[in-house]
Amino acid sequence: MDSRICTSFARLMASALCVSTLLVTAMPFDLRRGSSDTDLDLQGHVDLGLDDLDKLRLIFPPGLIEEAFSQAQGKVDMPLPRQRTSSRSSERWAPKSKRFDFGFAGLDTYDAIHRALEQPARGTSNSGSGYNMLMKMQRHG
């Protein structure tokens, strides 16, 4: 498996773990007996404000939080995202997928630098690898 696929999958799983941790800590569960003795009916209620949810949307990819809410059993109150208005203060907390992508772009750049420093440049000695790495970063940048 390609290392980029593994890295992307690990990042996605880490995001899902963070979302599930936040949901579990914010959700008081009522444990009740289900139809049989071994079944438990988990009914949770999440009371997150719009500000909290909008901040989570800036950190995690679009759709991940909604998916986590939809998979939760029981009653979940899902606030709708804020609508954009003309004021700049409301746009600051509006969900933007570009902010999430930009956060991982820094990690991708770090991975590219790390790989370039580990591999010596072809046809040159190890002393030229730093210069070639900088040239690669200028082309990507």
UniProtKB/Swiss-Prot annotation:
GO cellular component terms listed in the entry, alphabetical order: extracellular region
Predominant location: secreted
Superkingdom: Eukaryota
Modified residues annotated as Histidine amide in this record: H140
GO biological process: neuropeptide signaling pathway
Endpoints of the signal sequence: 1-26
Protein name: Neuropeptides CP2
Underlying gene: CP2PP
